[in-house]
């Protein structure tokens, strides 16, 4: 859970990113024409090579890989029980070899999970703004630097840049993720900036690509800014305004121990908050 002021939601983002990305143009229908009768047809046409798309990750296999990974600290592994990373990524449809992105990656906990899930043939972008990296005497900067030291996560590409100046290629990402960040964007900067945040990420997704938004559930009428939560309905409205198709999952990370009245840092619920996942699809 990260709470911070994010500089990228200043005037530049409000002006440049708040406008939802335009829907992809519809494909042009081309009518096939029959070959003229006098054209000879080859007696034996070459067989088309069948390309089988990789299946989504195997939850048990990825869970085992995360538990066994010598690169992961004991502290990182201890969070798996509450965050259920393999189940979440399987729900989002990530596959070995995918191009993935972790937006507001902070110290890179989700970045490393994505790295293991996509495997050596995949790529993971880890994006942070300078404001995020500068927090707490550059704690996130130091943590991410240590995590990537010695090329230990060789498939990760670090992107220290604002969302208003992304160098991640447009329409290149299969699955993106932002974990426990969206409430900060919405609560600190309002719905327009929240739509801009999602729209900027949408621009990096392939047609049919998916963005997963994980956050602490709040309830209408509560002081969710103080509690570091968000009403899922507000997140859904922002995602729809940004042009996404929205699917909500309230089961994978649900927690009956959380009554939504406590600050997420309260020891009674810390690490056990009731969380929702938005599976946001960029229309094809």
Where are these regions (language model features)?
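Bacterial signal peptide processing site
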Residues: 18-21
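Conserved class I S-adenosyl-L-methionine
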Residues: 95-106
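A short acidic, Gly/Pro-enriched loop at the edge of an enzyme's catalytic core
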Residues: 98, 166-177
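A short glycine-rich, Lys/Arg-flanked "PGG" loop and its adjoining helix->strand segment in the class I
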Residues: 115-116, 192-207
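Conserved beta-strand signature within the Rossmann-like core of class I S-adenosyl-L-methionine
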Residues: 124-125, 208-217
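Core SAM-dependent methyltransferase catalytic element
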Residues: 242, 257-284
